Design a protein with these regions (language model features):
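Non-catalytic C-terminal accessory modules of carbohydrate-active enzymes
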Residues: 1-127
Length: 127
């Protein structure tokens, strides 16, 4: 798993090193569709977990990923989420929904319930 998280741009096939290409596919032979897509799904779940009316951000962030950002991730309920984190804590969140709905957002140990309006971006900053 540790080598799986190593970013690589290698184009040749090699049985050593492993890693991940920019498109999130595995950099090792043979091509395994379950491993490639399964890994992308696992990374998504580490960053955001959602169910109807609830979104949890950074539930399982690796220690090595202290700072980062995500753009355009989909949560259940057709909610698009962008967020940034610093030192492992959420700094900024943007949400946009295709329809009106109530959703509880949990991050940094805080839960907030908000009402989303169709195609209107909602911003939250945590400092």
């Amino acid at each position: 798993m540790k080598n799986q998280l190593r970013y690589t741009r290698e184009e040749n096939i090699s049985c050593v090193g492993g890693g991940i290409y920019p498109n999130m596919l595995c950099a090792h032979p043979p091509f395994q569709i379950d491993g490639n897509f399964g890994f992308a799904a696992a990374v998504a779940e580490m960053l955001i977990q959602s169910r109807k009316g609830y979104i949890l951000l950074l539930p399982a962030l690796p220690d090595e990923w202290k700072d980062g950002k995500v753009r355009g991730m989909k949560a259940q309920g057709d909610i698009t989420v962008d967020f940034e984190w610093r030192e492992g804590r959420i700094h900024r969140v943007r949400r946009c929904s295709s329809h009106e709905q109530k959703v509880t957002l949990e991050c940094n140990g805080i839960s907030k319930t908000v009402f989303l309006k169709p195609d209107r971006t909602e911003n939250m900053i945590f400092d």
